[in-house]
Structure formats: structure tokens, C-alpha cells
Amino acid sequence: MYSEKKHLIQSSINSRDIDKSRSAVPTVVEQSGRGERAFDIYSRLLRERIIFLGTGINDQVSDSLVAQLLFLEAEDPHKDIQIYINSPGGSVTAGLAIYDTMQQISPDVVTICFGVAASMGAFLLSGGAKGKRLALPNSRIMIHQPLGGAQGQAVEIEIQAKEILFLKKTLNSLLAKHTNQSLEKINEDTERDYFLSPEEAVEYGLIDKVIKNDK
């Protein structure tokens, strides 16, 4: 599991590549008394305590996001941190590293779904601070059980199957905690891809509020 095969256990939409990197990142230029200074847009938003999860989740993405959370906690342990989520999911263990950090740090973590929060993306969305889990009106949210693939000798397949079942139990128990749904219902609903609108996600307990456009 913790060898090169650990990434066989995933939680994602297959049509999205979890290693897809951002392309053409915009740059913003700020004027100061010392002249101009250029930032990539994500670094600039980090100064406003805004983090983007806009790709699939792997170890590299997880390490970067955890580092940003820890940095912002050190900057101000009392001010909220916002995570915007548009992710198809990815590595379960990498996602749990982000989740554990969200729960461990002092600031409340506001989670906001834009686009799609699927699989581990939806799990992280639900793990935001209660009352501060949000979604934009046309976003989509999907939960399901971890996906797994096993290869090698029979004993290796058995070990990986046990690990998948362990991760499934862990994720479903935490989803039940964050949604106030019964574990039995979570187990049933995650047997297949379970898509929800933002309004349905509020009713389900995955989020707390839909951000409405009042213009």
C-alpha cells in the first residue's frame, strides 16, 4: 500500500487526470513605494487567506495545500481560511492528509465548492467548519466509495483489498459525522456515484449554504 502501488487506491472521476497541472497561471502586478512587484494569482490570493484546490488530489497537491494551511495558521491563528474546491478527487491518503490538517489547525476552514467537488473533493468540502461549508449555485457534488485496483500475487491483492475496505470504513464514518446521516445511509449512498445539486447537498448535510447571486 505504501510502496509505489499506493496510488492504485483512488477516489476520483476517471475522465479527469489527477496529475493535470495548471497552465497559463495569470500574474498580477502591484505598485508600491519601491516600484512594481509581480505575483502569480494564487500567491496573491494566499495573502488574502484564500487557497485553491483546482486539480485532482495527489501527494504533491496535498503537500502544497497542507503547507499553505500551516503557513496561514502561523500568520494568524484566529482568522478564517477559505478553500475553493473544484476537484474530481484523487488519492485517498493524500486527501486525508489535507483533511487531518484542516481539523488540526486553529483557524476555521471555510470550504467553497465551485464547478465540481467529487469524491475526495466532496469529502474535503464536507470537512469544513460547521456553518461555513458553501457552494455556488451551479456547482455539482458527488460522493462514492474509494476506487481500487489490485495486481500481483494473491496475497498482495488480499492486502490491498483489506486496505480499501479500511479506507472505505474510515471515509464513510467521517462523512456520517459531518453530515449527521446514519452510517447505514452513507454506506448505501456511496455504493455508486451519488450526485447532488447544492440544494440537495444542504439537505443531505454535506454543506450548510448555497451562495446566491442577488444581482
UniProtKB/Swiss-Prot annotation:
One of its GO terms (molecular function) is serine-type endopeptidase activity. The active site is at S119, H144. It is found in: Cytoplasm. One of its GO terms (cellular component) is cytoplasm. Keywords: Cytoplasm, Hydrolase, Protease, Serine protease. InterPro entries: ClpP (IPR001907), ClpP/crotonase-like_dom_sf (IPR029045), ClpP/TepA (IPR023562), ClpP_His_AS (IPR033135), ClpP_Ser_AS (IPR018215). Pfam families: CLP_protease. Its EC number is 3.4.21.92. GO terms for biological process: protein quality control for misfolded or incompletely synthesized proteins. The keyword Protease applies. It catalyses: Hydrolysis of proteins to small peptides in the presence of ATP and magnesium. alpha-casein is the usual test substrate. In the absence of ATP, only oligopeptides shorter than five residues are hydrolyzed (such as succinyl-Leu-Tyr-|-NHMec, and Leu-Tyr-Leu-|-Tyr-Trp, in which cleavage of the -Tyr-|-Leu- and -Tyr-|-Trp bonds also occurs). It is an enzyme of class 3 (hydrolase). The keyword GTP-binding does not apply. Its main location: cytoplasm. Cleaves peptides in various proteins in a process that requires ATP hydrolysis. Has a chymotrypsin-like activity. Plays a major role in the degradation of misfolded proteins. Belongs to the peptidase S14 family. Fourteen ClpP subunits assemble into 2 heptameric rings which stack back to back to give a disk-like structure with a central cavity, resembling the structure of eukaryotic proteasomes. This is ATP-dependent Clp protease proteolytic subunit 3. The lineage of its organism: Bacteria, Bacillati, Cyanobacteriota, Cyanophyceae, Synechococcales.
